[in-house]
Amino acid sequence: MRVAMTKPLFAWDCLEDSPSLGTVREFLQSVPDEALLGSLRAWRGKGRDDYPVGVLWGTLLVSIVLRHPTMEGCLGELGRNAGLRRLIGIETEEQVPKAWNMSRFLDVLGSEPHRTLLEGVFDRMVRTLAETVPDLGRVTAGDATGLRARRLRAKRGGDEDLPVPAGGRKEYTDDEGKVTKVVEWFGYKLHLLVDVKHEVVLAWRISSANAADNDELPEVLARAQKNLPKDRIDSLAYDKACDDGAIHELLDDADIKPVIHNRSMWKDELERMLPGHDGRSNIVHDEAGTVYCYDKVSREPVRHPMAYIGHEQARRTIKYRCPARHEGWTCPSDQRCNAGKTYGKTVRVPRDIDLRRFPPIPRATKKFERLYKGRTAVERVNARFKVFWGADDGNVVGARRFHAHVGAVLIVHLGLATLLAAAPRREGTLGKMRLGPIAKALRAKLGLKQ
């Protein structure tokens, strides 16, 4: 890979459409699959070994790395490309596996205990990156996307622990609640937790197409926390699908700042009196938790958003100040509100009143909007899975095969992310190739050539 020095650490736009043999070799070397291959060999036992499990596993990974739309296309290239064959342990053209061998291998890979070990490969790769990249996982975002799949024609035992493909439907509405767009698919839902800055997946989970996002997020978050150093996650952005009281309590217990827009549930009310204030107070809040003060001295009451000062973690309160004093303009109610106060009127809102309504980062702040825009990172990751690596092609039949295939795609995602971070950087057109400190550390951990 040729990556310029000015590119970010994970330069996804520098991915090669057709990776070189050197890139494929380094990718295969970066995948910690010893335990998985050992389990597969033990499962095979003394049976026929015409196509070793290492060859089948390497063929699966290479088919995704080289972006073949079908397995037959990858097998055809292996038959023609002797150099590529040798990378995965195939000496002759006759030793290239057949399409049905790969289909059976996917079925085995998606069964226990191999499926858990496959997920363990992903977890180890995340931990390696998290130990080397100090800010990986600090600012995160989550989302779910639909993936097309096909169901087996005949029922069989062994898939009871896996969700089966089902019909999914998602409606998009405008501000008035009218449906503007409907997306339907048959298959599964893929739930991701992604680092916003680096666009690297930290944890994932496959569920039924009609599963609710707020039901799946706790398990995805727990897996991400295991993969990252303690207290690494600072904030988590999600759409309204996770605007749930239980989710806010979960994030509060983990000391993670939620960046989640709230659902509109008030029918006729526009504002309410802040709890703890009576009818003589001029402090109110809207459904999103934005705090306002009323100027009651003017002929007609005028509502002003109060100035957000910060989150007081020790007190578990959100501090607001008189907007006129904070921003330097004159308010007719200054004498009434701020008499004898140099700093101006101060309001502290206890978050425990309603964790969902009053998050540590109020929704009306620029910081909230900036962090909420980080959700686009998940959409870009979803696009790579679907368009670049073909996870949404719908060519995989059966729950076991689908889970194995998606797990392999995620391993390819992390493997190529690791190579991007470990790639030498080019200083200008005629400049030398240099390794940064993170690249040196990664290459040393993976045993790659310095």
Language-model segment annotations:
Residues 79, 272-312, 351-397:
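Short amphipathic alpha-helical "interface-anchor" segments enriched in bulky aromatics
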Residues 315-360:
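Long, low-complexity, polar/charged, intrinsically disordered or flexibly structured peripheral segments
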Residues 1-39, 421-450:
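Charged, often Cys/His-bearing segments associated with DNA-binding zinc-finger transcription factors
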Residues 49-120, 395, 400-403:
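Short, positively charged, Gly/Tyr-enriched micro-motifs
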Residues 55-58, 101, 213-216, 377, ...:
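Catalytic-loop motifs flanking and including active-site residues across diverse enzymes
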Residues 368-450:
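Basic, amphipathic alpha-helical segments enriched in Lys/Arg and hydrophobic/aromatic residues
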Residues 102-268:
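Polybasic low-complexity intrinsically disordered regions
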Residues 17, 21-66, 101:
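Basic, short loop/linker segments at the boundary and entry of helix-turn-helix/winged-helix-like folds
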